[in-house]
């Protein structure tokens, strides 16, 4: 991002969930103009990591947040499209490699069809609108969305992948402005994803079903 000049477009915050590759050394971060390094020390996985980042951004007064994975697979040159979406009043912008202008490069076969046939259809049904690429963490959220009392993303129920699924659908359910942004997601040739075990896959399906059944909604009259 620093080499591409992206760091000049917005403040950059790194939310670390336990990196051990040396990329978060203080001197390295300073040389890249990173504003803050947040380190998750408590329980939970991705959702806990994201809650930490969202909370910091809201407390610091930011009006919008763009999130992107740190694995180098996403097209950082697409970040201005997310910033433009936020500036135009969009509340939730989701990256998609499958819409016009997007590109899916070397996506593993099983992952491609799991998104197309399971993940995206279920979350589209839950959202009440068509969404094409629902597993991506490359997204933008408005302050209005995350701070809405009908959303409440900082609850402890969000620990693993629940928050990504929930926030994917909740904006549409509330009638907020939602768009998909064309991006490129590139996997190295021949890469076989190993991040999610068989047990993890069952857990993911359970999360999708709970999202579909609105089990992550706040328990109040406003939900």
Per-region residue spans from a language model:
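Short beta-strand/loop segment that forms part of the nucleotide-sugar
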Residues: 1-2, 9-19, 39-40, 68
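Hydrophobic helical membrane-anchoring modules
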Residues: 2, 16, 128, 152-223
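Residues at the C-terminal ends
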Residues: 6-7, 59, 87, 173
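Residues at the starts of beta-strands that form the adenosine-phosphate
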Residues: 10-11, 64, 177
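A conserved acidic beta->alpha catalytic loop
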Residues: 16-25, 72
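Acceptor/aglycone-binding surface of glycosyltransferases and processive sugar-polymer synthases
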Residues: 36-59, 76-157, 188-196, 202
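Residue-level signature of catalytic and energy-coupling elements of molecular machines
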Residues: 53, 71, 142, 171, ...
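Short beta-strand-to-loop acidic/aromatic patch adjacent to the donor-nucleotide binding site
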Residues: 62-73
